Amino acid sequence: YYALSNIESAMDSVGADNLDFLLIPRVSEGESSLALDVIDTFSPEYILAGETDADLNEILKTENYNLAPAADINIGGAELKYKTTNKTSTAVLGMSGADAVIVFRPSYVPDTKGDILVLRENLPHGISPENYNLTVLSADADRASAVMGKLLSLGADTYATGGQGNIRITVFPSGRILTERMD
């Protein structure tokens, strides 16, 4: 999300007014640019950061957070497994009904399986998107079309956010996955 209003709208649509957990995988415009606003607005109970900068360090002094290259956390009936190295940054979110694999820094992500695959900008080595029920590409508009073409040629059921709008994914306890494009 590149606008706090998009996050607020998504939270309002499910009747949520606070966050249990905020993951900040790394300091970059696409992954942490709204972190301070989100922390201030939604007061997450727990924050996990793969890395920080001076601005983030300042606010995290007063928050319940952990700076770690890996974590295995259970919150609100969901399980998050997170790992970052100099080659990759991934999270596996286990929810009732489905598992989502989120690849923040693509390089090599072997043996990672799930129902939903969320990618940033490139397809990492070691992942077969056709093995997922849904693939979402979060990339800039100029990069999205080339990567989308590759994903579609591999047989992936794929959506892109870059230049096309945000995607809402709802996972039901039955395992049914509903994907909607948000205005």
Task: Identify the residue ranges that each predicted region occupies.
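Non-globular, low-confidence helical/coil segments that flank catalytic cores
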Residues: 1-183
